[in-house]
């Protein structure tokens, strides 16, 4: 099977921002654009605050920490993913519980997610693979029914 992966789409505006970052010497996870981005993003999603991170790994780690996930807890994840979806689970001391995927979409099977839920389950991390979105309606319904947060 061949999976088509596209190159980044960087337009003129993105190039201008990158040049401004280079000129300001802040080409990192800190600098004058971070606060502005966080404020605009918070307004866009309708919340008081937003926190940006330098990677998806750090974002998942922070979210799990804020949810209080720790040793003895379980987090449901797909087996077909980048390791950054699983490593933060182990960073907080929890156990990743792998739920099989649908071979036609590469996404977790909602019915198997529900079967994997135990008293120790503290989060579900669905991962959209190769442009195929997970069945978020079904996963959201499961998440809400069991009161288990979903990190997407």
Where are these regions (language model features)?
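N-terminal "arm"/small-domain region of PLP-dependent enzymes with the aminotransferase-like
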Residues: 1-27
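Solvent-exposed, non-membrane alpha-helical residues enriched in polar/charged side chains
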Residues: 19, 23, 38-42, 61, ...
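Conserved acidic
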Residues: 26-29, 33, 135
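Phosphate-binding glycine-rich loop
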Residues: 30-74, 88-91, 98-100
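PLP-dependent aminotransferase-like
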Residues: 65-152
């Amino acid at each position: 099977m061949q999976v088509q992966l596209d190159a980044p789409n960087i337009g003129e505006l993105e190039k201008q921002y990158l040049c401004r970052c280079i000129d300001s010497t802040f080409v990192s996870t800190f600098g004058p654009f971070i606060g502005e981005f966080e404020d605009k993003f918070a307004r866009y999603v309708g919340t008081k605050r937003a926190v940006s991170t330098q990677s998806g790994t750090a974002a998942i780690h922070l979210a799990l920490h804020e949810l209080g996930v720790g040793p003895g807890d379980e987090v449901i994840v797909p087996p077909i993913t980048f390791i950054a979806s699983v490593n933060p689970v182990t960073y907080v001391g929890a156990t990743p519980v792998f739920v099989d995927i649908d071979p036609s979409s590469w996404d977790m099977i909602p019915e198997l997610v529900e079967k994997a839920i135990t008293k120790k389950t503290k989060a579900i991390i669905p991962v959209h693979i190769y442009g195929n979105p997970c069945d978020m309606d079904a996963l959201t319904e499961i998440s809400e029914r069991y009161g288990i947060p979903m990190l997407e």
